[in-house]
Amino acid sequence: MMGRCTPWIIGGIAVLATGGVLAATATAMLAENFSLGVLLAFFAFAMIGVGVSASGTSVLVLLAKRVEDHRRAAAATIVWLMMILGLAMTAGITGHLLDPYSHERLLVIALAVSLIAVCVSLLALVRLEGNPGSINHASAETAAPRVPFTHALREVWSEQSARQFTIFVFVSMLAFSAQDLILEPFAGIVFQFTPGETTKLSGLQHAGVLCGMVLCALACGRFGSRWMGLQFGSLRVWTVGGCLASALALIGLVAAGMIGGSYPIRANVFLLGLFNGAFSIAAIASMMRLASTGRGHREGTRVGLWGAAQAIAFGTGGLIGAAASDFSRYWIDDPGIAYGVVFFAEAGLFLVAARLAFRIEPQPHPHQAADKSTSYTAKWKRKEHHEPAI
C-alpha cells in the first residue's frame, strides 16, 4: 500500500482542505483572541504545506511511473496547465464572492471550495493508478532490486545533473514563493485594493501563469522548434529566459511601490505571472526528462528529491518574504518602498536561478545511453571471445 501513490494523493488533499478551512477560521478568530488565532493559523498553514507537498509530489511520482519517457514532458505540461487553470478560476470566483467582506462569508467560501476540491480529486483518481503490478513498464525480471531509501538518495545526489537541478529548483521556488504572500497585502496597502480586489489580482496573476505555460508549450513543440530555425523550442532557453524576465517584472513592482496609484499594477502582475508560467513549465518539462536519466530505476527518488526541494523552498520563501516585508516596513516609513526592497531581493534570486539553470548539463536520453552501453559491451565480448565484428 505504501508503494502506491493514490492514498498519498487523497491524504494530502484531505489535509490541504482541512488546513484551508482552519486558516479561514483562524482569520475570524484573530479579531477576538489574537494569540489563539495566531496559533491556529500556524497549524493551519503547516497543514496546507504538508497537504500540498504530499499530494503534489505523489502526483509527479505517479506521472513519472505511469507515463512513457517521450510523453512525460507533455503530460507534466497538461497537469500543470490544469492546476493553474483551477487556481485562476478559484481566485477569480472567490474574489467576486468575497465582496462585501465578512468573516462568516470567508468561512463559508473556504468550506465550499475545500469540499469541491476533495470531491473532484476523488472522482479524478478513480481507476487512474491501476494495479500495483502495472505501474512499472519494466518486467519483473528487468526491474531494479529494492534498495534502502538512504542508499538510493545518496546515489541520486551523486549524479551531477540531479544535484544541479535540485539546487536550481530550490532557488527558483524560493524567489517564486517569496512574493506569493506579500503581493496581495502590497496591493491592499499601496493601492488601497479591497480583499476581493486583491483576490482577483491573484487570479489575474494565475491567468498570466496559464498563458505563459501555453506559450512555452507551443514554442517547445514543432511550431517553435521549426520557426525560422531558431532555438525557440529549447527548454533551457525558456527556463533561463523566464527567470530573467521574472526578475524584470519584479523590478517593475519595485517601481510600482515608488510611483503608487497611477502605476499599471494589474498589467505588471499579469506579466509577472506570464514569465513565471514560462519558466516553471519549462523547468517541469526538464524535470520529467531528467527523471529518467542516471543510474537504475530511480524516477520516484529523483522526483521526490526535487519535490522536497520545491516544498521546502516554497514554505521557506513564503515565510522569509512575509518576515522581510514586516522587517522592511518597520525600518522604512514608506510602505511602497519597503515592499520594493523585498521585491528587489526576489529579483536577485531569479537572476541566480537563471545562472543555475544555464549551467545544468543536458543529459542523453536513457535509451541512447542504453544503446551505447550495449554496443560497448558487445565490442568487449567480441574482443574477449575473438568473434568477428558483424
Where are the language model's segments positioned?
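Helix-to-loop junctions at the C-terminal end of transmembrane segments
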Residues: 1-3, 98, 212-235, 325
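Pair of pore-lining "gating" transmembrane helices in MFS-fold secondary transporters
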Residues: 46, 157-179
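Glycine-rich segments within core transmembrane alpha-helices of 12-TM secondary carriers
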Residues: 73-98, 306-321
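C-terminal transmembrane helical hairpin of 12-TM major facilitator-type secondary transporters
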Residues: 235-283
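Short amphipathic helix-loop junctions that connect adjacent transmembrane helices
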Residues: 181-200, 326
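Juxtamembrane intracellular "pre-TM" segments in multi-pass secondary transporters
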Residues: 132-166, 190, 367-390
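C-terminal ends and interior cores of transmembrane alpha-helices
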Residues: 9-35, 240-261
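Symmetry-related core transmembrane helices of the 12-TM Major Facilitator Superfamily/SLC fold
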Residues: 17, 105-124, 336-358
